Amino acid sequence: MIKNLSEQTASFGLCPPRCYYVPFGGAQKEGAREDSERFVSLNGTWKFRAHEKLADIGEDFCSEVLPDEIPVPSCVQYFGYDSFQYTNVTYPFPYDPPFVPVKNPAFHYSRNFEADGQGRLYIVFEGVDSCFYIYVNGKFVGFSEISHRLAEFDITSFVRPGENRLDVVVQKWCAGSYLEDQDKWRFTGIFRDVYLLKRPEGHIVDYKIEPRLLEDGSAELLFFHRGGGEA
């Protein structure tokens, strides 16, 4: 059974925040991110199963053969797995922060991916509503509940050379939903891109470019970075 982390923390296992970029190989010319040899899209058709609540997901869910399919990115409501819901000034569930209803729909996604076992491997979710749990080869990697935040996980220690299994469980509501009471339709699922980033062991993680105007009227451009090695 998956332990509900939503009432305890906003995230677990996430990489520290960084500026947004997709790395390219040293010999590559920069371009669209899909052209990078270090970018692997996981968009497409995933295996899928809908549950009425998190507790309905069994102990061996990471080895389960899921009966349905769903495109990623998308929202589950468009495929009949949950009802469309619109609210503006009222909450879409009983107000009792940080708690949400026990009968809180949960959606299990799964797919396989290949890894070469070289360097470091990261997985990036650009948007999941509302919270989600990620497992690689049956092992818990992490959790995030800020729907529109990019969530990046280092999965190097969880993968093996060859085929690997990825399982993601998404809940409709979480504690973070109390901060998202906006005038909008309520949609659920992996609604933005998912991809892998392949990096060498030593690499730039984060950077900052800072322009400065000097007293003599000239300017300088400073480059700060975290991490090192091949960019």
Identify the residue ranges that each predicted region occupies.
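Beta-strand-rich binding/interaction modules
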Residues: 121, 134-136, 217-231
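A short, compositionally biased
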Residues: 41-44, 128, 228-230
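Surface-exposed, low-complexity/disordered Ser/Thr/Gly/Pro/Asn-rich loops and linkers
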Residues: 84-99
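Short, solvent-exposed loop/linker segments at the N-terminal edge
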Residues: 211-217
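Accessory carbohydrate-binding/adhesion or oligomerization-edge regions at the termini
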Residues: 1-88, 169, 196
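Accessory beta-strand-rich segments of carbohydrate-active enzymes
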Residues: 1-12, 28, 32-33, 47-51, ...
